Regions:
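Short, flexible coil/linker elements and helix-boundary hinge sites characteristic
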Residues: 6, 99, 103, 181-182
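Acidic/His/Gly-enriched intrinsically disordered linker/tail segments
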Residues: 1-63, 67, 84-85
Length: 192
């Protein structure tokens, strides 16, 4: 069996963390620093680097989910793994199939996270939750307006109602929204 078939893409890479790093320390570390620079940073320990990279990986995954959807990304990776069993596909093949299927430039997104140093900043307004009733069904609909004044994209994650992705897989209950740089977006979501 090839290495790709052993990878569980739904949970990200396995990371063994030693010393804990707080979220604020992670944000402080990445402010003004690229992934490229992190790989050669002599001041960060191996376990800490793994945790820092895990946070970057999670952000990349959320960015892709915001663009193509959680279920679609899951199904793509599952199909890619199944169609390449006992093979060693290179990254270019994964990239080509991803770009063809979703019409999204995967390399551009990964390069941004590898080279980028700026962190987004967000302003949130008009945050509210409304009770919506229709045909004896009640839903909590959350909404807000989010402004990103920076030049880099931001990903906003909301906890929403879970859903079936097929094959006995349940969605994470999280929905990711991409807020491009210098833009504002109104988000409305079923919170369950």
């Amino acid at each position: 069996m090839n290495d790709l078939a052993k990878v569980d893409f739904s949970n990200g890479p396995m990371v063994y963390v030693g010393e804990e790093i707080s979220y604020s320390e992670i944000v402080t570390y990445w402010k003004g620093k690229s992934m490229r620079e992190a790989f050669v940073d002599q001041e960060v320990k191996g376990e800490q680097l793994q945790k820092l990279l895990r946070k970057k990986y999670e952000l990349i995954q959320k960015h892709l989910q915001a663009l193509v959807g959680e279920r679609e990304l899951f199904n793509f990776m599952k199909q890619f793994k199944q169609s390449h069993l006992f093979m060693r596909p290179d990254f270019e093949e994964l990239e080509r199939e991803f770009n063809t299927r979703f019409h999204v430039n995967l390399r551009e997104i990964l390069d941004y996270y590898y080279e980028g140093k700026e962190l987004p900043a967000l302003f949130i307004r008009d945050l509210k939750v409304e009770l919506y009733e229709e045909d004896e069904e009640t839903k909590n609909i959350g909404s807000c307006k989010i402004y990103n004044p920076t030049s880099v994209p931001a990903v906003v994650t909301l906890s929403v109602a879970t859903y079936s992705m097929g094959d006995n897989e349940i969605g994470s209950g999280l929905r990711n929204y991409l807020i491009p740089g210098h833009s504002c977006k109104e988000i409305r979501a079923d919170l369950g």
